[in-house]
Amino acid sequence: MSDTAERVKKIVIEHLGVDADKVTEQASFIDDLGADSLDTVELVMAFEEEFGVEIPDDAAETILTVGDAVKYIDKASA
């Protein structure tokens, strides 16, 4: 798992209070990890702060899984 993936996983665990083994790259924030719309907004803000990237609303709407977040952050940080 990449450094970005590890950091995303840590943020998800802290914000959603889920078990680490549930946070896989395929895990959906809403369907698999029990996040609601407010949780997803808070996660995006936490990702922006942690990685120093800006995630516009239209992009945030496409980040549905842990893997989506990792891919977007890696691309935005490149």
Curated annotation (Swiss-Prot):
GO molecular function, one term: phosphopantetheine binding
Cellular compartments annotated: Cytoplasm
SUPFAM superfamilies on file: ACP-like
Modification O-(pantetheine 4'-phosphoryl)serine occurs at: 37
Domain Carrier: 2-77
Pathway: Lipid metabolism; fatty acid biosynthesis
Free-text description of this protein's post-translational modifications in UniProt: 4'-phosphopantetheine is transferred from CoA to a specific serine of apo-ACP by AcpS. This modification is essential for activity because fatty acids are bound in thioester linkage to the sulfhydryl of the prosthetic group.
PROSITE patterns, per the entry: CARRIER, PHOSPHOPANTETHEINE
Any single GO BP term: lipid A biosynthetic process
Entry's Gene Ontology cellular component terms: cytosol; membrane
Major localization listed first in the record, in broad terms: cytoplasm
Keywords: Cytoplasm, Fatty acid biosynthesis, Fatty acid metabolism, Lipid biosynthesis, Lipid metabolism, Phosphopantetheine, Phosphoprotein
Entry keyword annotation includes Metal-binding: no
Function noted in UniProt: Carrier of the growing fatty acid chain in fatty acid biosynthesis.
PANTHER family: ACYL CARRIER PROTEIN, CARRIER DOMAIN-CONTAINING PROTEIN
Family (UniProt): Belongs to the acyl carrier protein (ACP) family.
Protein name: Acyl carrier protein AcpP
Organism of this sequence: Mesorhizobium japonicum (strain LMG 29417 / CECT 9101 / MAFF 303099)
Lineage, highest ranks first: Bacteria, Pseudomonadati, Pseudomonadota, Alphaproteobacteria, Hyphomicrobiales
